[in-house]
Amino acid sequence: MNMKTHIIFIALFVLASSSYSQNTIISLSKSTENRFDITQIPTIIDTLEVNVKLANIELLSNNKSSRLSNYIELSSSGLMKIFDAGKPNIPVFSKLIECPLDASVSFKILGYDEEIIDLSAKGFNEKIIPAQPSISKSEVPNKFYIDTIAYSEDKYYNADIIAFEDAGILRSVRIGRVEIRPIQYNPIQNKLRILNNLKIQIVFSGSNHSKTEEMKIKYSNSAYDNLIGNFVPNLVRQQQSRFVKTTYVIVSDRKFQSTLIPFIAHKQQLGYNVIVGYTDEPNVGRTTASIKNYLKSLYDSPPSGYAPPLYVLLVGDVAEIPSFQMPWHVSDLYYFDYTGDNLPDVFYGRFSASNINQLLPQIEKTIEYENKTMLDTSYLQNAVLVAGFDNSKEIYTNGQVNYATNQYFNSSNQITAYTYLQPEPPNANYSADIKSKINAGVGYVNYTAHCLSSGWANPSFERSDIANLTNEHKYGLWVNNCCNSNRFEILECFGEAAMRASNKGAVGYIGASNSTRWDEDFWWSVGFKTVSLNPPYNANNLGAYDKMFHTNGESPDVWCNTQGQLLVGGNLAVQQSTSYFKLDYWEMYHLMGDPSLAIHIAQLCVANFINQTVTANTTVTSCREINVQNVTVTNGATLTLEAVGNIYIQGVTVNNNSKLILDAGGEVNIISNFDVQLGSSFEIK
């Protein structure tokens, strides 16, 4: 360690939820809750306005028998901890915003109400606890960090009220992270400086609006834009034509050509423009560089009549389609970043297979699931949610599972959740019971704690167990927030085994190719929220769970409907955070499976309107998508199609003074035979 940092290590430091025994709430205003809003000013171009209101702060004093008896913890709803190791842990607000291309970012502090709080006068003579580094799930924390210089200076820490971090371009949106610091701390005077009713302007200078609009016209897609719609004020919203067929690119080894035929036909039938590149073709090649160049060329300059790709599927194991070798893990991320900023510009996945026998089950399970040809779909109303064993981190594992069940996986949403919390009761036999539930059929599996590349640590569920599963025709999405379960450069990791299994296993698998972290995994699923056993919902800080559901009044624009969206949506929750390991999460987390596959939890939520003649006013609604085939609207009737997701049209005729109204939260995909005859009309809302 460089001694110039003046950071001292104290051995065997463990932060546990039980360390703090007393708490004091200090009211700061008459408000009942904190507010942190970023809005666009309609009358001022290139300016956003930030408004911060603090209702109270909470001080938690340490159990005097603990090693941490010299410290107190400061918290406030919606404010989050930092990871500046050794410096005072003064929580901050953090939010993602949209920025115009080429713009530089500056700030104007318009005003605030200042309040000084003397902690000693409130009975707190201890220092505020120092921030600690993010902890990997593969390590045992045994060091305590304190920056002696930071604690010996007679000045307010966090004096910079606002900071900006440029993240990059996510397909059609340039995003950045704004960090607001309304609380400052002087460790010598033992005082807090509160900046309440804080008002700030974020000013964009040198914005290239024409370039921004061009980017949106070319690349804007609701599936991507919607992921950030919840927390990004849209400075420019250029409407692209919604009559567009989505481009789906497959990169495969030639030996899989005949096996892929039904999958390609299936995707084409759903309305995708499918492009297939084989690695023996000169413009594709077998190296990471050549494949990346091939994909980037399609993204930058798609063939005539094609939109830039939205989905990309790699078909083959690393011997067929190599992955990028990072210092400590493999990553497919860089196949899908076309702007050089480490953010993906398409949704992506991999069918990992070395031979046809490994590939065919993945194709068959995907087509069956997407076509809803299972004889019994009721299993989709079941979920397995597992908090794995770690006796010092139950606040993370149980907190994540509790959030999932309290908010979403419950009877209010017609879901039966099989939950496994820690500690495991005597004779509960979690491991056997979990496998039994999966055999009976579940639509969603989520595990958080420790893994190896071979599977879950405790409760045990390993690669060798997958061969004994019996969940034929009852496949679901498995999401694993743990280390190495998707370490796909080895012969066969847990995620690959789950996907390759014939007539059993998973239809999609999300997991990491390296060691994950406690805070970041929690945020990936729950959102950027304070870790607790029962975290509350926060509309400003959405995680993967929130983005799959809509029971808290979220706009449909922010839902994650597909497996590829969920992967990106979870990583965006980490991107919003104060973590220093955001790039690791983009690199490590992978989807084994079809990125375009819609996630079905509980009700299928897909409306099929087929072989119908509409002679009276009719409305068809769906909370995901509508498939329309061979429909005639006549006799002056109005047919209204309302979908949260996409509308797919294969054969529609509107005649005899009739009307068709299309209201899609996603895209309207005209696949074939769209005929609106003279005297009739159609409308897009």
Question: PLM ranges: what are they?
Answer:
Residues S21-D280, T287-Y311:
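Extracellular pro-sequences of secreted precursors
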Residues P233-F243, I601-V620:
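Low-complexity, Pro/Thr/Ser/Gly/Ala-rich linker/spacer regions in secreted
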Residues M1-T24:
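Bacterial Sec-dependent N-terminal signal peptides
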Residues Y157-N158, I169-N186, K191-K199, S220-A404, ...:
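Active-site-adjacent structural elements in enzyme catalytic domains
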Residues D337-N371, S453-N540:
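Catalytic cores of nucleophile-dependent amide-cleaving enzymes
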Residues K296-W328, F389-D390, Y396-E492:
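Catalytic-core segments of thiol-dependent peptidases
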Residues A131, S136-S138, D147-T148, A607-K685:
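Extracellular beta-helix/beta-solenoid repeat scaffolds
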Residues V276, A319, A387, R487-Q603:
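Active-site-proximal C-terminal subdomain of hydrolase catalytic domains
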